[in-house]
């Protein structure tokens, strides 16, 4: 009987700390839980939360969409570029078809999302397949959204969802002190950086 040596232990690469806002922004899409959709107009429909988090300041931008597509992703980029007060150098996403054609038969053809990134001079970085931990900041924020927002809210229309999501993000997330930021809020970190320029 042959004895096989044990598999080598996986050693993750050290995390690359960002040095300034806009250096890299993580983007992902969250499916809104169907339990939050209680009106006959919205039962059976699907709503989506697009989320972007700046890795340096943890500043977050969210937007509600009725579809999960490369068109919605391109629209989200346009709104993110207008909302973020600094130049965006890189956007990191997973391998979803709303972001890339990497695992489709059109792999060489850029998506509308990628074309919009190119128009703004933004580099697109995709994470390794099946490694959501590489987009950990945005994934963690989605878990917090489940606890703080979706567990306690109902939506009676798409407009109602979009309005409540906007209020929640403005009130709760960007003004919430965070330990990795030295107990400052994302808005405070961004303001301090912009004042130092």
Tell me the role of every PLM-derived stretch.
Residues 1-33, 37, 97, 108-114, ...:
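Basic, flexible linker segments flanking DNA-binding modules
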Residues 9-16, 23, 120-122, 143-197:
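C-terminal domain-tail junction helix/linker
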Residues 27-60:
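An active-site-proximal beta-strand-loop segment
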Residues 45-46, 62-90:
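Active-site beta-loop-alpha junctions of metal-dependent nucleic acid enzymes
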Residues 59-63, 125-127, 151:
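Short small-residue beta-strand/loop micro-motif enriched in glycine and branched aliphatics
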Residues 64-65, 101-107:
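Short, solvent-exposed loop/turn segments at secondary-structure boundaries
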Residues 88-98:
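Acidic beta-strand-to-loop metal/phosphate-binding motif
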Residues 93-95, 104-107, 112-117, 122-147, ...:
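RNase H-like two-metal-ion nuclease catalytic core shared by retroviral integrases
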